[in-house]
Amino acid sequence: MAGHSKWANIKHRKAAQDAQRGKIFTKLIRELVTAAKIGGGDVSANPRLRSAVDKALSNNMTRDTINRAIERGVGGGDDTNMETKIYEGYGPGGTAVMVECLSDNANRTISQVRPSFTKCGGNLGTEGSVGYLFSKKGLILIASGDEDALTEAAIEAGADDIQPQEDGSFEVYTAWEDLGSVRDGIEAAGFKIQEAEVTMIPSTTVELDAETAPKLLDLINRLEDCDDVQNVYHNGEISDEVAALL
């Protein structure tokens, strides 16, 4: 995972995401309902649900809305028949792309996902074609703090790895099941958590140039525009120099 900055590579997408907040809320509620259905409504015992709640709160969703979604999931309402489906493929520049979807109609979902790859010079692969390049991890972002103190607190809490970033922030990696407990330990030590989520971390990355990077971003945007797509993971690496040209 050395050198990989997942957060740096998504900053440029924040504005586009904010512009479609209604769609984001729909996806967040869908994830809350599904997480509660699968793992129960106790946030402390359900890492997926806690991650979904944290993400919803960071997008300014109200507690009432979150609680209603959880109640629907636990109660088994009409909208809880969603299933998680992962699609794998190759994007511009040979990048590996994983698309996490929640859907009650696989045919509808694939009819949205496949053309996105095709239009951007990529292709949808078979199950397992790129999945082996990713590991499911918990990822915590700390905006600033004393490195030694954070390292001690994170290790004590059960973190796997702590990586300082050039801007003074820190990325803390955990087993995905331990995300909540590690987060609690770091917060108890006095550090402010900027973001925390369960994500997919690539074992290797592909450096993208100024010609290829926009094509990958176009693919990501097209996929995230699909109603059934919850998350898009990739192993493309965009340097600060290339990002400045976009």
Swiss-Prot record:
GO terms for biological process: regulation of DNA-templated transcription. Gene3D superfamilies: 1.10.10.200, 3.30.70.980. GO terms for cellular component: cytosol. Keywords: Cytoplasm, DNA-binding, Transcription, Transcription regulation. It holds the Pfam family TACO1_YebC_N. The keyword Acetylation does not apply. It is found in: Cytoplasm. HAMAP family: Transcrip_reg_TACO1. Belongs to the TACO1 family. This is Probable transcriptional regulatory protein APJL_1171. It comes from Actinobacillus pleuropneumoniae serotype 3 (strain JL03). The lineage of its organism: Bacteria, Pseudomonadati, Pseudomonadota, Gammaproteobacteria, Pasteurellales.
